[in-house]
């Protein structure tokens, strides 16, 4: 309990003194890069394979997904080259951050289970039908061993790293100390949940994102939030395999 309280109230992130112009520059890099890299990866696969572009097929979803996610790393690299700022954070080491992340995941998942059940019951009550997301259907229906390995890599490794760079490493870090603590956590969490474009996953993702902000704030090291995010996605992938496949 004492360790949990330390995680909840600790703050190893100093105020990030970057210029508003640099912040907007990073946002532009992310938006433009995601469009360009995603289109480039899809076009490259279409050219190499000779297949027509089909965004309901696993190979093209993979190409688009990798382009979309890796654009965050490219945006972060360009931002680091151009922005000038002093780092005054006090991060813990990577192993300690991973430990914070593992503890955070265990705690938040216990919260997510009732959250998912109550949220789904609420949406069912007001007449909103559940629809399986395309990536879920594609994972369920499978593909070649290489395609499935790439899909799992994208979901469990690439997406957590790239999304944490944007939502926690940039957005939350920028708002931390500029807004009250609650708002600095809520704003990036709302954006994170909305960007997944799925009403059924909105509330669980909002709760998850709040936890991701808290563990990052507590450790000052993105490894903590990446650990939580990766474990969450891994559990979801395992659960998808346990659900009866639904034909597209």
Predicted segments, located by residue:
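Functionally important transmembrane alpha-helices
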Residues: 182-248
């Amino acid at each position: 309990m004492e360790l949990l309280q330390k995680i909840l109230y600790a703050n190893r992130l100093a105020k990030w003194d970057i210029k508003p112009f640099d912040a907007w520059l990073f946002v532009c890099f992310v938006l433009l890069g995601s469009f360009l890299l995603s289109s480039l990866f899809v076009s490259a696969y279409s050219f190499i394979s000779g297949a027509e572009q089909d965004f309901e097929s696993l190979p093209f979803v993979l190409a688009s997904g990798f382009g979309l996610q890796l654009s965050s790393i490219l945006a972060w690299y360009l931002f680091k080259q151009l922005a000038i700022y002093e780092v005054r954070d006090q991060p813990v080491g990577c192993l300690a951050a991973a430990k914070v992340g593992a503890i955070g995941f265990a705690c938040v998942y216990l919260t997510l289970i009732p959250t998912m059940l109550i949220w789904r019951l609420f949406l069912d009550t007001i007449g909103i039908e559940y629809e399986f997301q395309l990536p879920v259907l594609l994972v369920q229906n499978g593909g070649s061993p290489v395609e499935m390995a790439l899909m799992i890599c994208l979901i469990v490794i690439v997406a957590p790293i790239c999304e944490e760079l944007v939502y926690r490493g940039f957005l939350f870090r920028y708002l931390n100390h500029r807004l009250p603590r609650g708002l600095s956590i809520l704003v990036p969490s709302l954006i994170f949940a909305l960007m997944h474009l799925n009403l059924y996953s909105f509330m669980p993702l909002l709760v998850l994102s709040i936890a991701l902000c808290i563990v990052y704030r507590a450790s000052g090291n993105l490894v903590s939030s990446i650990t939580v995010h990766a474990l969450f996605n891994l559990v979801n992938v395992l659960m998808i395999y346990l659900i009866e496949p639904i034909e597209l």
